[in-house]
Amino acid sequence: MSLIDLIKHPLNPELISEAAIQLGESESNVSKALGSLFPAVLGVFAQHSKQKDVINALLETSSLDFSENLLEKAGNSPEIENIISKILGEKSEHILSHVSEYTNINKSSAENLLKVATAATLEGIKKCAHENGLDNQGILSKLAENRCFIPALLPAGMSLEHLGLENLLEKNTEIPVESSAPITHKTKEEVKILHQENSEKSSFWRYRD
């Protein structure tokens, strides 16, 4: 599966129906909101200036499994809240306001769905890395490869400009992050991360056999 398909996979009709019931919103509006939010999150993650933060976010959530009970886990995860604050920052308010207005849902509902979209995006990136044996630079390259697809993911009437991502497709001028050892797939119980904090240029994904 492609990176985008891995992210979209858990955002299925069952989750949309469950979210609509919990949030008191219509399924069609929840679907439109998630259809706007996950490309927005992916777009922010793919921005050149966010490279180091994205790798740190993957490390921060490396032991978390959002593949099941995504709605509940994302909503109750302090790690996801921290990542939204750190990576999306002030841009999150811009995104939430436009998505809330565009989809006619409450801003509090949009906030909850942003957590879901962020968790799904991180989980999709981790799965893509595991399946393809990607190191840090490989992950960033994969994100860069998918930038051009993001505008087409947005629902009709929503644009990169609405989400504050008008510069997303500009050419990358950042210095690449130094590669680390490839990520090999292991079960969640086997995952053990060693992050070398004494080096800002490298981080290592290691798994206990």
Predicted stretch roles:
Residues 1-209:
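A structural "flexibility-hinge" signal
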